[in-house]
Each structure stands twice: as C-alpha cells, then as structure tokens.
C-alpha cells in the first residue's frame, strides 16, 4: 500500500511517498515544493496545488496524511500556513483520498519515540527506518515521518478491527 505524507508550508511544502508491505516500510520518493515569495499569494497557492496534483498523479497513493498547523506569534504567517495546508487537503480530497491529520508531536513520538524530538532527530530516524533514502531536505523528512506515522496508525486500526470482528 502506498502512503503519501505532506508537511505543508507556503514557502516550502515537503512530500514523501512510502510503500508498506506487512510491517516493512520502503521509500518511494520525496521532495520539496517551493514557491517564490515575490509572487502573488493566489499564484503561489495555485502553483502549490498544481505541484501536489502532479505528485499525487505520479505516485498514485492509496492513503495520505498531512501534518497539522501550529500557530505562532505572527498571525500573518499562521494564516498563510493555514492556506497552504488547505491547498494540501484540497489536493488530496480532489484525488479521492481520505486524509489523516497528525499533530507534529504525535509524528515525532511515532517516529522518534518522544514528542519533543528536534528536526535532526526526526531526519535521523527517517533515514534509519527507510534505509538508503536521500532526503530532499528537512521538510521532505518531516513529510516522510507523517507518512510513516499514518502507516503505523492505519496498521493499528486494521489490527484492532480484526480483533473486534473475531471476538
């Protein structure tokens, strides 16, 4: 099964695709979509949508997940991040995918073992869980971590459903 993870941002959106067979994870591809800050906001959002649509068409994921947005003290930045996240959610929904959403601390805990992990720890564990992966950057590593988290949660939910049906 192919999982796509997204770490949305207006300046840089990370994406990562993995395949899961049983309990084995394999890297398919990862990348970062960048938009030019000198462009109009609407144009940047349109470019983000087009790039995400191309990633989805290219890798044909069956499951997808997006990292939730954390607010910060700059309301304008938080709003723009929310708009980029909306484009990510829309792009996945447009492709007919159901979408998991995870708080960054949940992703860190699932991949590193602690919700307070830093970016370098996340990158190191993603590299360990997906041997041979060449990370396109920190946002791509975060996106792969989101995909891994969703794969774990999906496997747990499937196992639970099987146990409930068997009882």
Curated annotation (Swiss-Prot):
Give me the comment on cofactor binding.
Answer: Binds 2 Mg(2+) ion per subunit.
What do the Gene Ontology cellular component annotations say? cytoplasm; Holliday junction resolvase complex
Q: Where in the cell is it found?
A: Cytoplasm
Extent of the signal sequence: none
Catalytic activity as recorded in UniProt: Endonucleolytic cleavage at a junction such as a reciprocal single-stranded crossover between two homologous DNA duplexes (Holliday junction)
Could you tell me the keywords of this UniProt record? Cytoplasm, DNA damage, DNA recombination, DNA repair, DNA-binding, Endonuclease, Hydrolase, Magnesium, Metal-binding, Nuclease
Residues that hold Mg(2+) 2 according to the record: 67
Q: Which InterPro entries match?
A: RNaseH-like_sf, RNaseH_sf, X-over_junc_endoDNase_Mg_BS, X-over_junc_endoDNase_RuvC
Under the heading Gene3D superfamilies, the entry gives: Ribonuclease H-like superfamily/Ribonuclease H
Function summary: The RuvA-RuvB-RuvC complex processes Holliday junction (HJ) DNA during genetic recombination and DNA repair. Endonuclease that resolves HJ intermediates. Cleaves cruciform DNA by making single-stranded nicks across the HJ at symmetrical positions within the homologous arms, yielding a 5'-phosphate and a 3'-hydroxyl group; requires a central core of homology in the junction. The consensus cleavage sequence is 5'-(A/T)TT(C/G)-3'. Cleavage occurs on the 3'-side of the TT dinucleotide at the point of strand exchange.
- HAMAP family the UniProt entry points to: RuvC
Q: What is the protein named?
A: Crossover junction endodeoxyribonuclease RuvC
């Amino acid at each position: 099964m192919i999982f796509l993870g997204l770490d949305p941002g207006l300046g840089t959106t990370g994406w990562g695709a993995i395949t899961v067979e049983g309990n084995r994870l394999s890297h398919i591809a990862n990348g970062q979509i960048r938009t030019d800050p000198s462009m109009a906001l609407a144009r940047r959002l349109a470019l983000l949508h087009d790039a995400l649509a191309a990633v989805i068409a290219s890798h044909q994921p069956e499951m997808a997940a997006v990292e939730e947005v954390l607010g910060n003290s700059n309301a304008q930045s938080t709003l723009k991040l929310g708009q980029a996240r909306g484009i990510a959610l829309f792009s996945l929904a447009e492709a007919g995918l159901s979408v998991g959403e995870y708080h960054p601390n949940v992703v860190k805990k699932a991949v590193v073992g602690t919700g307070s992990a830093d970016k370098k720890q996340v990158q190191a564990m993603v590299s360990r869980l997906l041997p041979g992966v060449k990370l396109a950057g920190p946002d791509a590593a975060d996106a792969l971590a989101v995909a891994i988290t969703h794969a774990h949660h999906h496997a747990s939910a499937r196992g639970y459903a099987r146990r409930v049906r068997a009882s």
